[in-house]
Every structure is written in C-alpha cells, then in structure tokens.
Amino acid sequence: MKKQGLVWCLAATLATAVGAQELKPVILPAPQTDGGRPLMQALKDRKSTREFSGEKLPVQVLANMLWAGFGVNRPDGKRTAPSAMNWQETEIYVVTADGAYVYDAAKNRLEPVAKEDLRNLAGTQSYVATAPVNLVYVADLTKVTGDAGEKELFTGADTGFIAQNVYLYCASEGLATVVRASVDREALGKALKLKATQKIVLAQSVGYPKK
C-alpha cells in the first residue's frame, strides 16, 4: 500500500509540474485609449532603436500597444489600421521570454501558441533575443485574393500600417522599437505552428530603451 501511495504521489506531482508549464490564455485589460502625447509630437519622436533594457512590459502597456497596432476600434469590428478590402489578414504573434501567443483582437486576449522562449528565432540580430517583446506579423493568404505579386503588395502594405501604429505608440510612451525583415522564417514558422498558407511578413522588437 505504501508503494502504491508513493506512485500516486509521484504521479500527482508530475502532473502538477506539467500543468504549471502549460501556457494559458492571457486576458488583456481594456486598452487605455485616452491620453498619450499629441500626434505631431509622436511623429517627431518616432525612431528605430536597437538597444533594450531587460525590463518586461506591463500587461497594460502590452494591451495598449496591441490595440494601437491592430485593435478593434469600432462596433462593426473594423480596426485601428486599414487593410485592403477589409480582409484583416494580418495576425500579430507576441513572442516573449515566457512563450509565444497570438493576439485575438476581437476578444482582447492572447491565445497561447508555444511555451518556449522563441525570441532567438524572431530575428538574426543579437538584440532580438533579449528584447522583452517581439511582434511577428503573419499574413493569412487564404483571406487575400489576386496573384502572387498582388498578395505580396497587399500584405506588405497592410503590415506596414500596423508596424507604423506600433512605432507611434512607442514614441508616445517612451518605448524603444525597431521593425525588421530579417527573420528565420522557416524555423520560426515551424515553432509557431504556422500553416503553409500563413506567411511571416515582418517582425518588430519592443521594449524599454537601454539606459
């Protein structure tokens, strides 16, 4: 009986440990849509920065930034950035030290994708692996019509709108950011469990500036 009890105890401990490692959805706080610097000041302060401190972004800041990038800003589900034909084909993957998530704008939450730290796959530059947050912009090509060239044009432009929104939010809040095309697309796509019809367009590192 003692042996059987020990086995059950070990099994329960293992199950608890495994459960603790599982990522759970993150319910984001409502975005704060008031305040911030005036638009002209944010445009003046907008810049690319490639050095980050190790400080994590508070969840409220993350929620605000994702909403600014491509959140829902109208009752009809339309977004803060335009997309051709209102396809809304771009998904934002959020890669952090704690794991990787995909932003669900309609529900204002992060859905878990991978529990590993994938930041080293989110870019080829050394600073990418230490930036607190790497946003990976992924286009769902099943939502886009046209030939290959047209799809590339549409998805590139739509992603650019989102990245600029993030730039302006970061300028408004004193955050450091840089958008990048250099991504290990094959390795990162596999780690993020992307489908063949999903294409990584750009990535963007975000954090507090290094002091």
Locate each region found by the language model.
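Bacterial N-terminal signal peptides
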Residues: 8-17
